[in-house]
Regions:
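Small/polar beta-strand repeat architecture
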Residues: 175-256
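Short, cationic low-complexity segments
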Residues: 141-144, 238-242, 580-585
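Short, surface-exposed secondary-structure junctions/capping segments
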Residues: 148-153, 241-269
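Short intrinsically disordered coil segments
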Residues: 50, 133-137, 150, 232-234, ...
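Long, low-complexity, polar/charged, intrinsically disordered or flexibly structured peripheral segments
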Residues: 254-300
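Structured, hydrophobic secondary-structure cores that serve as assembly/anchoring elements
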Residues: 1-124, 172-177, 220-223, 302-585
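Autoprocessing Asn-cyclization modules and mimics
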Residues: 102-121, 126-200
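A short, compositionally biased
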Residues: 113-115, 163-167, 207-216, 556
Length: 585
């Protein structure tokens, strides 16, 4: 109903239908990788969105190993990456044998010798063994005096001022020879109330001093620290120490083991002056299963499988497979690396919206690269060779190329689009490659669908290939596969409104119209070949694609054909020399 129609109707309540319930189709963000690997700390097996390398270090720390996840993430952002997802893996099944990952922690006792507080690191790892936690009493922010005597059994008191007192405040009563503590349940005018009766007497002419008891907790990790002030011992307080720490600390969790005790018994007798202990990394016992993970349903998806339902991800990278080979008991041969890489490609094939970026072990040579390529035949994977040399903290380190390649893909998508081949692009933050390749070497690798990385003299070090691992010529190029994957993601996201609509010709026409408009714009943007839209794509959604059988099964079927642009891999010069013709005259 239009606003003009309402002008000519009497006042009342009218229903206005909205026929534009669907969202116009648009391209999703692309070039978003999911990384799986080893970190110093951070949530285990739970994907974390990371927006910069500094953000990565804040979440996951800086592992004191020559592993490859951190330099891969750094290389991704250095080369133009926008954001990514990271899953930290550790072996969690080896706790009984003493080899699995474990949280560091400590148990603290109060003045009575009872265990009062349990401190546990937020995540597994030996990093927690360097944590120091200090409980420190604070001087009172306010003080007041008792104005009426208190007898044993009292549950309320009249005081000179209630400024600085509120529900949950732990209050100390003190005269010349004794102290008592209560947790306030109510504050009203110049009266305070509590639940547990006092067992001693306090006189107003004592005098009896009242003050709120607060403290602070300081947590140190190296030169960094977290500090939480004005904390309360009472669970009824908004500043209850366990609640504040558990909601705001990035490093530890605290459990109050004596919540029913009197407030003065809930805290440690003195500051913890030694580090937490017992933290283990669980890295030496990593297996392929730890990287692959498991899918036990929502909230229980681990490792690589945790990415399967994050549809924003369109690249997969696991550079730490190469570190595990030779460093962990579960990766004794290259076959174990191959198992995980096959699962990467398998996930990409199941989701149809991502590509696995693969690499070889460090000491592989040219022939090894050609042999590794034969292990795969899929347009959902791409293989890069050789490794890169980077400088970290003044030391040269060789790293797998997947993180840097993911950054180049993200940069190319941002500057041009997913239809542009992510090749002939300079790799930033790299000083050399592990093995130099001649033009003939690179050509041979390219012919066998291995993407070479080559120094190009003054043009820097560049990715010199854009091929998938498919033997199908139609799906040979990365940009072709990524165009198709991007379309899948766009259609999956923006056609959700179709679900439960009446499956009738009117719906088919709307779907055909919207997809045609969308693909026409992509053709204008250079994503498809063809001089006209008819040459570039077609959309079919009619009675032919939606038979009675399909409709009875609750399906609406749309057939789409596109012709993505392909890269120019070779530049051919044809030169002809003409001899001067003799002058017969």
């Amino acid at each position: 109903m239009t606003n003009n129609a309402l002008r000519y109707r009497p006042p009342g309540l009218y229903r206005e239908s909205d026929k534009n319930r669907y969202t116009p189709l648009s391209l999703p963000d692309t070039g978003i990788p999911g990384f799986v690997g080893i970190t110093e700390r951070g949530p285990t097996n739970r994907p974390q969105k990371v927006t910069s390398y500094e953000h990565f270090l804040r979440l996951f720390g800086n592992l004191n190993l020559d592993s490859y996840l951190a330099p891969a993430v750094q290389g991704y952002f250095t080369n133009g990456g926008r954001h990514c997802y990271v899953v930290r893996v550790a072996n969690l099944s080896g706790l009984a044998s003493g080899k699995g990952a474990r949280h560091g922690g400590a148990l603290l006792k109060n003045a009575s010798g009872k265990t009062a507080v349990q401190i546990t690191a937020q995540s597994e790892g030996s990093w927690a063994n360097d944590l120091r936690v200090t409980f420190r009493a604070l001087p009172p922010r306010t003080q007041t005096l008792l104005t009426m005597d208190l007898k044993p059994g009292a549950t309320s008191a009249s005081i000179r001022s209630t400024h600085g007192f509120k529900r949950g405040t732990v209050v100390q009563f003190e005269d010349d020879d004794k102290k008592a503590h209560v947790s306030l349940s109510k504050v009203d005018s110049k009266q305070i109330f509590w639940n547990e009766p006092l067992d001693v007497e306090f006189r107003s002419d004592g005098p009896t001093l009242l003050e709120p008891i607060e403290f602070e907790i300081e947590i140190r990790l190296g030169e960094n620290r977290e500090k939480f002030s004005n904390l309360s011992r009472s669970p009824a307080s908004g500043s209850y120490f366990a609640r504040v720490i558990n909601e705001r600390s990035e490093w530890v969790k605290i459990l109050d083991l004596l919540p029913e005790e009197l407030p003065n018994n809930r805290l440690p007798a003195e500051a913890l002056k030694s580090p937490l202990s017992g933290g283990r990394d669980g890295v030496d016992s990593l297996t392929p299963s730890d990287f692959i993970g498991d899918d036990r349903g929502p909230g229980e998806r681990y490792g690589l499988k945790a990415f399967e339902f994050i549809h924003e991800i369109d690249l997969l990278c696991i550079p730490d497979l190469m570190w595990c080979l030779g460093h962990t008991m579960g990766f004794r041969t290259e076959k174990h690396v191959e198992i995980v890489q096959h699962e990467m490609v398998g996930q990409a094939e199941r989701c149809r919206d991502r590509i696995a970026i693969l690499e070889l072990p460090e000491k592989s040579d040219y022939k090894d690269a050609l042999g590794w390529r034969t292990l795969f035949d899929s347009s959902y994977g791409a293989l890069y060779f050789p490794w890169l040399e980077i400088e970290r903290d003044g030391v040269l380190q060789r790293v797998p190329p997947s993180g840097h390649v993911a950054g180049i893909i993200s940069r190319t998508d941002e500057e041009i689009g997913a239809h542009a081949p992510p090749a002939n692009q300079d790799i930033r933050g790299v000083v050399d490659v592990s093995q130099p390749l001649s033009p003939d070497d690179a050509g041979m690798l390219n012919g066998d669908c291995v993407n070479a990385v080559r120094p190009m003299n003054a043009r820097g070090i560049r990715v010199w290939g854009a091929r998938t691992l498919s033997s199908d010529p139609m799906l040979r190029y990365i940009n072709v596969q990524r165009v198709l994957a991007t379309l899948v993601r766009a259609l999956r996201r923006d056609l959700q409104w179709v679900v439960f609509e009446p499956n009738v010709p009117a719906l088919w026409k709307i779907i055909t119209r919207d997809i045609t408009l969308f693909l026409t714009q992509l053709w204008r943007d250079g994503m498809f070949r063809g001089n006209t839209p008819e040459d570039a794509f077609y959309v079919k959604c009619n009675a032919e694609t939606n038979s009675e059988e399909e409709r009875d099964a609750g399906r609406v079927v749309v057939e789409i054909g596109v012709s993505p642009v392909r890269p120019a891999e070779y530049i051919v010069f044809r030169m002809r020399q003409e001899l001067e013709k003799p002058d017969l005259d």
